[in-house]
């Protein structure tokens, strides 16, 4: 029986079963050692998720936001280092079914989104 893919708790990317996890697949939570070291999302990650959802709540149901808007909401003066954490937060929200990632007006899989993205509520 094939093993279904998992979603990394840290970065929100999907990952597939690997032979090295054969004995412990039920307990694997992270896609890589780097994500394992970073651990489960903390307070800042939750603030970013909340900022994304709050920004979308403030707009029309069909509106989109740029990830940089969420980063600026959390840290107005030093938002650039938060861009990758915002993308991670967005991927986790997609995994929860609370968000869609859009490029060029089309929904994209979080694992395949490269370059500029927009975030919106599911339709």
Where are these regions (language model features)?
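Short cysteine-rich clusters marking metal-coordination/redox-active sites
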Residues: 8-11, 31
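Short functional micro-motifs and their immediate structural scaffolds
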Residues: 16, 36, 40
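Short linker/helix segments within small regulatory modules
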Residues: 19-28
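Positively charged, polyanion-binding regions of nucleic-acid-associated proteins
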Residues: 43-64
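Short acidic, hydrophobic short linear motifs in intrinsically disordered regions
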Residues: 62-73
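Short helix-coil junctions and helix-kink-helix linkers
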Residues: 71-83
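A short, conserved structural fragment
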Residues: 95-103
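Short, cationic-aromatic polyanion-contact patches
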Residues: 105-123
